[in-house]
């Protein structure tokens, strides 16, 4: 499909929505204000306003594919957002600006909308983020509305109102309202909801949830609709309001409401990811069926697919620009051409990485960075990081660990479907599974030793050497069968498991440690790093604990709050120890000062899943991309 530029009239972009000032709207507006003020005195949510300075981070991202989730027109440009950040396109389809999650924005955007907040005096682009609250952009600068409580920072929806208030949907805390000065819960009926979408206005507000159907607010009254009231599914994906009608999209079709009352189900069985009312029809963006058009006639509507070809992937958003229908997928923007067929008008551009969700990192002797993905195989990046060779097949798809063996100059990929060995040229040479002697085909870690290697699996560990394969599990004294992490030094081997740590000497279990007989706070051992004559042991929920060769455990006094260390996301260098966490970024232990601190600013995600080092540079993989930074700037 040929990529084309797109043009749209400035009048269509800059037209301001007319503001109704009748009695009904005034009454509804006062109801919204009253609902907010009733909770403001005793339920105000503390927050800070931060003025962002994009581009000041010293963390450098490696080009990853853009993924689109939402789009909106603002000040003559089209803005597309997704996990990678916010991209501004001009009317010719050229990129005018990129604001990347991490270096420029504090978190990944999830939704965008335009409006004017009370006190701002000008239209703004509002960006709801996953974990860092609300961003407001006036075309020149960003301000960051950041609640102190992390639960209120995890946003899922944003809806600016004509009154100057901005409604925010959260993942766990329901709906809150920001008026430029205060942040408060919207209404008691909307607290603690898992909000998925917001639509409507002061007089007619619809709130979709993840599992509890849809709530309708009308002039101060609230009504909930679930499956018993006609909704085809309690999981609400999308909502569009048109006059007195509302359409609520679910994975099993669209519920039509008229005057606040359920009327009928449209497009039954269709996964309604996005909705748009246009020219007397309901356009439904689906998961795998492209765009389905449903005529809105009194007779029973018959859905029909839009365009001669189905759009690839999920349709995230539908837009009408200059009377033409546009569909946003995760990797492109399409529109219906004059001939009725879909044409691509924007693409996500070139990228080095095949995916954003990184699970493992390792360097080989040639300085190439092996990058594993959770479900996309692996890339072998050139030392310049400007190109990559992608490998993905039945065995190389879900990468748990990558390890380079200096002695043999081979790289091992521990995957969900075996241990795959590659030669120095990056060619696949051998696949080891249960049929080849492993105790299980799913491999979680691998450690090379002088005479062979040790393979960790959910069923125990397997030793491979010149004598063949032999396995060890709970029957032989292993503290737990499910092994996650390995670390070897001489004849000593540490095996981190779901149930504690086993210490082996000469392949025999010498000691087991759990919360019952050691300083461990959690039994689940996720990562182990050799630091001098000691070991730093990462746990899932208990942070990092020090373990010495005599079997003594000691906690770090400056690591008081518990945290989750991701599986095998630990790295020790001459100067520091790095631990990738689930929510807190990178925990950094300075070996000179013996103190910990955290590194989060500039990361594309606080979920750090893999770490590697080379030439004084640290490489950090996350579930939203890869960055690098000089170790001396840690």
Regions found by a protein language model. Give the residues of each.
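Carboxylate-rich, polar loop motifs that coordinate divalent cations or form catalytic acidic clusters
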Residues: 2-634
């Amino acid at each position: 499909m040929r990529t084309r530029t797109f043009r749209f009239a400035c009048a269509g972009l800059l037209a301001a929505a007319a503001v109704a000032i009748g009695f009904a709207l005034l009454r509804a507006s006062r109801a919204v204000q009253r609902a907010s003020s009733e909770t403001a005195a005793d339920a105000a949510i503390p927050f800070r306003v931060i003025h962002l300075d994009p581009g000041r981070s010293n963390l450098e991202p490696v080009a990853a594919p853009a993924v689109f989730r939402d789009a909106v027109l603002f000040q003559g440009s089209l803005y597309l957002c997704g996990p990678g950040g916010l991209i501004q396109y001009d009317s010719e389809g050229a990129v005018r600006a990129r604001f990347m999650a991490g270096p420029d924005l504090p978190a990944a955007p999830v939704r965008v909308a335009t409006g004017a907040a009370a006190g701002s005096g000008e239209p703004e682009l509002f960006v709801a983020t996953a974990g860092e609250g609300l961003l407001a952009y006036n075309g020149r600068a960003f301000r960051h509305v950041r609640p102190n409580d992390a639960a209120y920072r995890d946003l899922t929806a944003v809806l600016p109102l004509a009154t100057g208030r901005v409604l925010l949907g959260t993942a766990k805390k329901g709906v809150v309202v920001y008026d430029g000065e205060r942040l408060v819960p919207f209404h008691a009926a909307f607290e603690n909801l898992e909000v998925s979408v917001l639509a409507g206005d002061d007089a007619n507000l619809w709130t979709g949830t993840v599992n509890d159907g849809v709530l309708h607010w009308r002039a101060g009254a609230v009504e909930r609709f679930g499956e018993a009231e006609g909704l085809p599914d309690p999981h609400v994906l999308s909502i569009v309001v048109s006059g007195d009608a509302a359409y609520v999209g679910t994975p099993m079709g669209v519920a039509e409401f008229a005057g606040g009352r359920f009327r009928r189900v449209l497009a039954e069985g269709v996964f309604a990811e996005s909705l748009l009312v246009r020219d007397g029809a309901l356009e439904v963006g689906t998961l795998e069926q492209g765009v389905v058009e449903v005529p809105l006639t009194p007779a029973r509507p018959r859905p029909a697919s839009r365009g001669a070809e189905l759009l690839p992937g999920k349709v995230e958003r539908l837009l009408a620009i200059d009377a033409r229908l546009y569909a946003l997928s995760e990797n492109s923007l399409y529109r219906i051409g004059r001939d009725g067929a879909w044409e691509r008008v924007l693409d996500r551009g070139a990228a080095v990485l095949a995916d954003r969700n990184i699970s493992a990192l390792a360097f080989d002797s040639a300085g190439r960075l092996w990058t594993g993905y959770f479900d996309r195989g692996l890339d072998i990046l050139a030392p310049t990081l400007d190109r990559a060779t992608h490998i993905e097949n039945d065995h190389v798809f879900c990468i748990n660990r990558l390890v380079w063996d200096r002695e043999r100059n081979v790289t091992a990929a521990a995957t969900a479907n075996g241990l795959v060995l590659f030669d120095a040229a990056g060619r696949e040479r051998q696949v080891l599974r249960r049929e080849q002697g492993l105790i299980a085909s799913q491999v979680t870690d691998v450690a090379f030793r002088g005479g062979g290697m040790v393979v960790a699996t959910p069923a125990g560990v397997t030793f491979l050497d010149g004598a063949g394969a032999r396995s060890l599990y709970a029957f032989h004294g292993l503290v737990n069968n499910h092994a996650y992490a390995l670390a070897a030094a001489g004849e000593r081997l540490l095996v981190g498991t779901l149930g504690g740590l086993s210490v082996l000497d000469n392949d025999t279990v010498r000691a087991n440690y759990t919360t019952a007989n050691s300083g461990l706070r959690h039994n689940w051992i996720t990562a182990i790093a050799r630091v001098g004559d000691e070991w730093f042991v990462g746990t899932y929920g208990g942070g990092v604990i020090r373990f010495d060769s005599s079997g003594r455990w000691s906690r770090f006094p400056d690591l008081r709050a518990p945290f989750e260390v991701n599986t095998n996301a630990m790295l020790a260098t001459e100067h520091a120890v790095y631990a990738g966490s689930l929510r807190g970024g990178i925990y950094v232990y300075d070996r000179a000062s013996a103190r910990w601190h955290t590194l989060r600013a500039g990361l594309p995600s606080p979920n750090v899943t893999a770490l590697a080092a080379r030439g004084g540079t640290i490489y950090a993989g996350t579930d939203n991309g890869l960055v690098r930074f000089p170790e001396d700037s840690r």
